[in-house]
Each structure stands twice: as structure tokens, then as C-alpha cells.
């Protein structure tokens, strides 16, 4: 039942029941729906939302009707904090849970935790058999919805180069379908997730895959308020160039310019990424 949440949004705007339901349904039916006594057809609900100037995306976000998996607060705390012993303990607990119930969402959460550990320690704690299962799930995705894109992005450091590139290209080919949903959040998580994937490819010196993905992401038409991703793509291109020719001046100049613009957090992130790539280059003699 979610009619009462519609009622709250209607009243906030000073719209009467009569105004809201005119030409859509009877006032008595709207009243019963708003009091959670009956349900209404999907088309009726959409028309009522349109009448009070609320999109379906907004309603799903504001209401409790939107289905959200319940996440253990301990998992959220482990993901947010860089307390390695605590993170490892929660990760093992989550893996044990998945091994008992084989629930796909629990595997995604375990992979998310392992991804965080990989970022900190550069070690993959997800067992090989679970890695295989995880990628098998993504390889069978036909419609890359927000659910799957988020799950892939939250575990992207756990995959090998071919897997990162293959799934990333599937997502990019699905862009037009995602745009039909009219939500820029999908574009945001795509750009963020695949940028992480490109960084992972660069760190493995898989520059051909990385270059192809940068080229494809640059083709995506972004709304103005997401144009900051063009800066990240520029950074990633300079990172690729650095790995090829060892000239660090262009990438350090860009980081300095970002800092001069007052974007200290982003500049620090870029610098940390560069230091990691530099260490990788030295370690593996790329």
C-alpha cells in the first residue's frame, strides 16, 4: 500500500482530491487508495502522479514502495570505513552467508566488500569459485539496469582485463536503452564504474583495452551537470600516455590545474591514482 504517500505529496502542494482525480478516477476511489483501503491500476497511478506534477522516478525515490534490499548496518559500516580487520571479519561473515544460501544479492555484497579490500590491500579475497560465479552472472545479463551496473561497478577490481572490457562494452552498447528510462543517475554510475574499470586496466598495463573504453566513453553525450566526467576521461588518457612513454609531466600538470581550480578532493584522488600507477609501473617494469 502506498496511496498514503501519494496523499502526503498531494497535500504538500495544496492540491485537492477533486483536482487530483478529475477525469482519471472517482473521488471516492482516490480517497480509499489514499487511506490504503484499495489498490489502483498502474496506469491510474501514473496519471495521478502526473496530475500532481510528480514523476514516477521521484515517487519511487520518495516512497517506501521502491523495493530496496535490506542491507545489514554492519555491511554498510564496513564498506564506509577503512578498518581492515573489521572489514575482513565482515567480509568472511558475508561470504559464509552466501555459501549457505547462494543468494545472488549476498554474492554481490560479498564482492563489494572484497572490492574494498582490494582497493586498500591490492589483494583479491573473493574465492576463485565465487569469482567465476560472479562473472557468470554478469555475462548472462541482457538488460543492464541500475541494479546490475551498480553491482558490476562495486566489484570491478576483482575481474581480469578481458572480463572488465567485455562487460563494459556490453553496458556501453546498452546506453540507448538506459537513456529511454530518462534518468541521468544511470549515466552517472556507468561513467563512474567504467572509469574505475579503465583505471584497473591501466594499472595492469592493458592499455589497448583501456584506450578503446576511453574512446567509447567519450562518444557518450552527457548532460551539462555530468560534464566533470570529461575531466576524468582526460586524466585517464594522460594516465595511458604516461604508462606508454613514462613522461609524467602532462598528468602532473593536469593534477596541478585541477588543484588550482579549487577541486582539492579530486586533485588528491588523481594524485593517489597516479602514485599507484607509478608504483605498478616500477614493480612490474612496464
Where are these regions (language model features)?
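Charged, helix-prone or intrinsically disordered regulatory segments positioned adjacent to compact structured domains
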Residues: 55-129
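A short, Lys/Arg-rich alpha-helix, primarily the initiator
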Residues: 1-12
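Mid-protein regulatory/catalytic core that forms ligand/cofactor-binding pockets
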Residues: 96-203
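Short alpha-helical DNA-recognition segment
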Residues: 14-31
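Amphipathic alpha-helical segments of tetratricopeptide repeats
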Residues: 92-99, 133-139, 172-180, 212-223, ...
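Alpha-solenoid helical repeat architecture
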Residues: 64-72, 101-110, 144-151, 181-192, ...
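DNA major-groove recognition helix of helix-turn-helix/homeodomain DNA-binding modules
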Residues: 43-58
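"A position-specific structural signal for the A-helix of alpha-solenoid helical repeats
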Residues: 5, 73, 109-117, 150-154, ...
